[in-house]
From Swiss-Prot:
Its EC number is 1.8.4.11. Has an important function as a repair enzyme for proteins that have been inactivated by oxidation. Catalyzes the reversible oxidation-reduction of methionine sulfoxide in proteins to methionine. This is Peptide methionine sulfoxide reductase. It comes from Lactuca sativa (Garden lettuce). One of its GO terms (molecular function) is L-methionine:thioredoxin-disulfide S-oxidoreductase activity.
Length: 259
């Protein structure tokens, strides 16, 4: 038996919200018909029947349900594992790439002709609204990525893949240089079947070229969590030391990644 308590002084069926009136046939009112505020007696008793799940659903929506921390965690994971539902500008497309620390990766893509916007963030994990500290804990399964917005008429997806391969070593698992952790893994996260096909074919070609196993994961793009403003266009803004690096299209200056 489920019990619903109330502190309302003079509650009657006529004053109940519509959702509760609709289930009044499943409720039995305790006597007396009104209670002092200090009463601890149950106003309603809810007996199990075939419609009990529906009733409990309504009660849950009204804030009187029995959600557990596990339920909330599952909901958050479902959101984080859902698709990226952001919409690019008209005539533009999105692509996501993970290739180590996202500071240097973003600058590399900023320089690609046809790229109109870049953002760094977190994706592929289980935690909703993660922070940088969450990511660095190694417990959320997120990857540091750059989400690229580009004009497919001015920049092919293959051009983005070329930039991706050139920027990092895709044969080292969960590591790029001194940066170690699952957040630094190599990954291509696609939005369309065409992107997926191009990524798989490019990976096969690159593996033959290197004659080593390429560990790059190729997965559907999931919800993108924009990183803190501090990380956005980090090297272009000068980083910690204020040494700005060029974002000019086609620039081939070495990218110096510093904290």
């Amino acid at each position: 038996m489920f019990l619903l308590r109330t502190t309302t002084a003079t509650t009657t069926p006529a004053s109940l919200p519509l959702p509760l009136l609709s289930i009044s046939s499943h409720l039995s009112l305790s006597k007396p018909s009104s209670f002092p505020v200090t009463s601890t007696k149950p106003l309603f008793t809810l007996r199990h029947s075939s419609s009990t799940p529906k009733i409990m659903s309504w009660l849950g929506r009204l804030g009187x349900g029995t959600r557990t921390p596990a339920d909330a965690s599952m909901d958050q994971s479902s959101i984080a594992q859902g698709p990226d539902d952001d919409i690019p500008a008209p005539g533009q497309q999105f692509a996501q790439f993970g290739a180590g620390c996202f500071w240097g990766v973003e600058l590399a893509f900023q320089r690609v002709p046809g790229v109109s916007k870049t953002e760094v963030g977190y994706t592929q994990g289980f935690l909703h609204n993660p922070t940088y500290n969450d990511i660095c804990s190694g417990t959320t399964n997120h990857s540091e990525v750059v989400r690229v917005q580009y004009d497919p008429k001015a920049c092919s997806f293959d051009s983005l893949l070329d930039c991706f391969w050139e920027r990092h070593d895709p044969t080292t698992l969960n590591r790029q240089g001194n940066d170690v952790g699952t957040q630094y893994r190599s990954g291509i996260y696609f939005y369309t079947p065409e992107q997926e096909k191009a990524a798989i074919e490019a990976k096969e070609r690159h593996q033959k070229k290197l004659n080593r196993t390429v560990v790059t994961e190729i997965l559907p793009a999931k919800k993108f969590y924009r990183a803190e403003e501090y990380h956005q266009q980090y090297l272009a803004k000068g980083g910690r030391f204020g040494f700005r690096q060029s974002t000019e299209k086609g620039c081939n200056d070495p990218i110096r990644c510093y904290g």
